[in-house]
Amino acid sequence: MSTKTVPYTAYKVKDIELAEYGRREIELAEAEMPGLMALRKEYGASKPLKGARIAGCLHMTIQTAVLIETLVELGANVTWSSCNIFSTQDHAAAAIAAAGIPVYAWKGLTEEEFNWCIEQTLFFGEDRKPLNMILDDGGDLTNMVLDEYPELAEGIKGLSEETTTGVHRLYERMKKGTLPMPAINVNDSVTKSKFDNKYGCRESAVDAIRRATDVMLAGKRVVVCGYGDVGKGTAQSFKGAGSIVTVTEIDPICALQAAMDGFEVKQLETVLPKADIVITTTGNKDIVRPEHFEAMKDKTIVANIGHFDNEIAVSWLNEKHGDSKVEIKPQVDKYTINGKDIILLAEGRLVNLGCATGHPSFVMSNSFTNQTLAQIELWKNTDEYKNEVYMLPKHLDEKVAKLHLERIGVELTELKQDQAEYIGVTVEGPYKPEYYRY
């Protein structure tokens, strides 16, 4: 068991001179992130996160910079790393570093650098005080703490997790009895999963393919592997661009949804020979396997918008066909398999952040408002929670949504008292039971 700290490094970014450029974009994003700005106004004076030392591991983007500065405004000390080797926007990282917040992130990390950056966030300041809160995306920070620095777990009041993959890891730990602190599953808040995962991907999936390849998407045959919330948004993204979209699914309910939404649902092997683009969205492993690559036609584009790169057999590609690899431009690589060229984007990692700038600010405000509320709840009310995985209560989910309505001109109809009594709710909400599926 480790008892060491790590040497103090104030920050490490690609180029601190990019800070002014980053600051201008952060200010622009703030106007599109009304939820976070409302929390600053509501809680800025009371500082509910005072004393919290939050280590964050989440894509270091412009939108994340607004989240970080919101946590600081609410009283927290924050350190930050990125949860993906390609997702950092270097001007965003520079702006945060220039603001005096320790950040360790740059685009194009090696795996060794990736782990080093996460490790730097575990201890705060020159006196090396350990973290006491975790804000994670994918579970890499949580795993490092629990597997390599388990002695730190006792001092951690709680953690919040952003994405499907990380939530799966938390539930596995809970089942095994190895989760030593309470956790809030932010991913499955309605205002996260039905907005970030669906509407975010609906905008960013096509954006990434266009920026990376400049291909015409209208008329192209696109295979979307998976029809969960991410798959739904991704399929709609390509459909809106005029692509001919086919979905693959293991779940009969999701498969039926895809069919009723107007998509063909087929097995991957059936549609691969004619596919122009294949994109994985499942959060599972081994979706595009060696035999699938061998069945693809010349110039097929392959990408992933799930959290990790193991949805696609990237290791096999590099082991068996690495000698044919040609970098067309950063995060766009060509492999030759049986005389056919295959185009792999972002090395099989998150394509919307590797090849573009991720989701728009407005939809990320939904997710990050959830994250902020989760951190406040765990920090202030730790004793009310067991070492289990929890959801944010529905009244907070509704609050997140309400904070974003004015920005897009939404007018809510007000429920009358007798109407509220008729359906068994209060005038103020929550308006739906816990079992309601949006």
UniProtKB/Swiss-Prot annotation:
Sorted alphabetically, the keyword list is: Cytoplasm, Hydrolase, NAD, One-carbon metabolism
GO MF annotation terms: adenosylhomocysteinase activity
EC number(s) reported in the record? 3.13.2.1
Which InterPro entries does the record cross-reference, listed alphabetically?
Adenosylhomocyst_ase-like_sf, Adenosylhomocysteinase-like, Ado_hCys_hydrolase_NAD-bd, NAD(P)-bd_dom_sf, S-Ado-L-homoCys_hydrolase_CS
Where is this protein found?
Answer: Cytoplasm
Its gene? ahcY
In this chain, NAD(+) is annotated as bound at 163-165, 197, 226-231, 249, 284, 305-307, 352
By its UniProt entry, which PROSITE patterns does this protein fall under? ADOHCYASE_1, ADOHCYASE_2
Q: Which reaction does it catalyse?
A: S-adenosyl-L-homocysteine + H2O = L-homocysteine + adenosine
- Family indicated by similarity: Belongs to the adenosylhomocysteinase family.
Enzyme class comes to hydrolase
Quote the cellular component terms of the Gene Ontology held in the record: cytosol
Cofactor names:
NAD(+)
Q: Supply the name of the protein.
A: Adenosylhomocysteinase
Among its keywords, does the record have Protein transport? no
Q: Which residues are listed for substrate binding in this entry?
A: 61, 137, 162, 192, 196
Q: Name one GO biological process term.
A: L-homocysteine biosynthetic process
The beginning of the lineage is: Bacteria, Pseudomonadati, Bacteroidota, Flavobacteriia, Flavobacteriales
Role played: May play a key role in the regulation of the intracellular concentration of adenosylhomocysteine.
